[in-house]
């Protein structure tokens, strides 16, 4: 049996769905699953300190290979002792491969078998990223969980294009495995692609499972498709992945999508959504989204969320938060970001309890009704 640096332990399956309760053991600690991972693109979760993230209960955070490669540079971070030491974070870190950022640069990139040529968004210089380079950068960063370099095709691209793309991504995954110099302390995940095509998802998963990665990511979702389309892809993709390894749905952070992903057997999620919307004054609460900058909250001296026990809700009012954000004060962004991250990490805690109690579907229904989703449009 292969000795992986990342291992998944299944604790319990929910009786009525594909949801599973477990934990993932990494070189920098163990965290429970299902789990939402805050995103620290530039080696920091925007406005939050490592101590605050630990208070929130984030046992793992995500950082971005592409951005750290460009600035300050992966070799500098290696000289600093690795990403954990550089950013003073002693728990687990996951790094993406840079593939999604390159996907986002559609107008300035060129994809070949060797890799991707694109323009540096900081200074316009020409850059080249290959599977080997993506692995080398992540080896220098020293993250606990790494991602294979992949192409993320658009969800509605033609079948023939997506087929060629997933076949190239499989070849890139094999090249990345061979280039990986730290398999003893960094777990490399394969990324299943295939847009909305079931047979291509099946082909991609079969290729990658055959390479025996310690975990698997589901990519190419949350890129413009509908909620129903995402659920349909998860319905036929997640069962293709090994039960004894972690499953990670990339780029998903809307509460309903988190719950529906868990129902389909996903263990890990990440998204910039909670911090991005928080900085603009949009807060997630147990009764739906609340835009605290709105004028009606100017004299509202109640907490953001009466059902939340986070630091922000225990100490500050909607009126004060509105004042800070209207005045462009960083402290306001810190407080709303803290709350939104706490909300999603705590939502996953509630989901784990619902799995333990075998009542996840009832929890989902109750949550959707309170949050304000039209549950009839969120069928699964």
From Swiss-Prot:
Residue positions binding Zn(2+): 308, 310, 313, 339
Cofactor(s) recorded in Swiss-Prot or TrEMBL: Zn(2+)
Active site: 96, 270
Keyword terms, alphabetized: Glycosyltransferase, Metal-binding, Queuosine biosynthesis, Transferase, tRNA processing, Zinc
Pathway(s) served: tRNA modification; tRNA-queuosine biosynthesis
Record bears the keyword tRNA processing: yes
Annotated substrate binding sites: 96-100, 150, 193, 220
GO annotation (BP), single: queuosine biosynthetic process
GO cellular component term, pick one: cytosol
Pfam families (alphabetical): TGT
GO MF annotation terms: metal ion binding; tRNA-guanosine(34) queuine transglycosylase activity
Region feature (RNA binding): 251-257, 275-279
EC number: 2.4.2.29
Cofactor note: Binds 1 zinc ion per subunit.
Record bears the keyword Transferase: yes
Transmembrane segments: none
Catalytic activity: 7-aminomethyl-7-carbaguanine + guanosine(34) in tRNA = 7-aminomethyl-7-carbaguanosine(34) in tRNA + guanine
InterPro entries xrefs: ArchSynthase1/Queuine_TRR (IPR050076), TGT (IPR004803), TGT-like_sf (IPR036511), tRNA_ribo_trans-like (IPR002616)
Subunit and interaction comment: Homodimer. Within each dimer, one monomer is responsible for RNA recognition and catalysis, while the other monomer binds to the replacement base PreQ1.
Protein family per UniProt: Belongs to the queuine tRNA-ribosyltransferase family.
Primary role: Catalyzes the base-exchange of a guanine (G) residue with the queuine precursor 7-aminomethyl-7-deazaguanine (PreQ1) at position 34 (anticodon wobble position) in tRNAs with GU(N) anticodons (tRNA-Asp, -Asn, -His and -Tyr). Catalysis occurs through a double-displacement mechanism. The nucleophile active site attacks the C1' of nucleotide 34 to detach the guanine base from the RNA, forming a covalent enzyme-RNA intermediate. The proton acceptor active site deprotonates the incoming PreQ1, allowing a nucleophilic attack on the C1' of the ribose to form the product.
Name the UniProt record assigns to this protein: Queuine tRNA-ribosyltransferase
Organism encoding this protein: Streptococcus equi subsp. zooepidemicus (strain H70)
Biological classification of the source: Bacteria, Bacillati, Bacillota, Bacilli, Lactobacillales
Name of the coding gene: tgt
């Amino acid at each position: 049996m292969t000795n992986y640096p990342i291992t998944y332990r299944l604790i319990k399956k929910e009786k009525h769905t594909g949801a599973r309760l477990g934990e993932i053991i990494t070189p920098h600690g163990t965290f429970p699953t299902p789990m939402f991972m805050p995103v620290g693109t530039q080696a920091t979760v925007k406005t939050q300190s490592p101590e605050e993230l630990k208070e929130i209960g984030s046992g793992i955070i995500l950082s971005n290979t592409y951005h750290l490669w460009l600035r300050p540079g992966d070799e500098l971070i290696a000289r600093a002792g690795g990403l954990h030491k550089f950013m003073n974070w002693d728990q687990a870190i996951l790094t993406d491969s840079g593939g999604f950022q390159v996907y986002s640069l559609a107008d300035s990139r060129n994809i070949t078998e060797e890799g991707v040529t694109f323009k540096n968004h900081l200074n316009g210089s020409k850059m080249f990223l290959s599977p080997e380079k993506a692995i080398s950068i992540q080896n220098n960063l020293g993250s606990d969980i790494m991602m294979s370099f992949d192409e993320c095709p658009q969800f509605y691209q033609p079948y023939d294009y997506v087929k060629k793309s997933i076949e190239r991504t499989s070849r890139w995954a094999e090249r990345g495995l061979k280039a990986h110099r730290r398999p003893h302390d960094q777990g490399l995940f394969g990324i299943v692609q295939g847009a909305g095509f079931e047979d291509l998802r099946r082909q991609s998963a079969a290729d990658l499972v055959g390479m025996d990665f310690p975990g698997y990511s589901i990519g190419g979702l949350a890129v413009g498709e509908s909620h129903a389309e995402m659920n349909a892809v998860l319905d036929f993709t997640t069962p293709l992945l090994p039960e004894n390894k972690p499953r990670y749905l990339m780029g998903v952070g809307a509460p309903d999508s988190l719950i529906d992903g868990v129902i389909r057997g996903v263990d890990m999620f990440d998204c910039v959504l909670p911090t991005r919307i928080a900085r603009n004054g949009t807060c997630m609460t147990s009764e739906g989204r609340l835009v605290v900058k709105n004028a009606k909250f100017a004299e509202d001296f109640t907490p953001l969320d009466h059902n939340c026990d986070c630091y922000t809700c225990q100490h500050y009012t909607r009126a004060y938060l509105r004042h800070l954000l209207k005045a462009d004060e960083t402290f306001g962004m810190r407080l709303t970001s803290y709350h939104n991250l706490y909300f999603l990490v705590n939502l996953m805690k509630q989901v784990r309890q619902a799995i333990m109690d075998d009542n996840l579907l009832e929890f989902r229904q109750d949550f959707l009704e309170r949050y304000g989703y039209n549950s009839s449009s969120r069928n699964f």
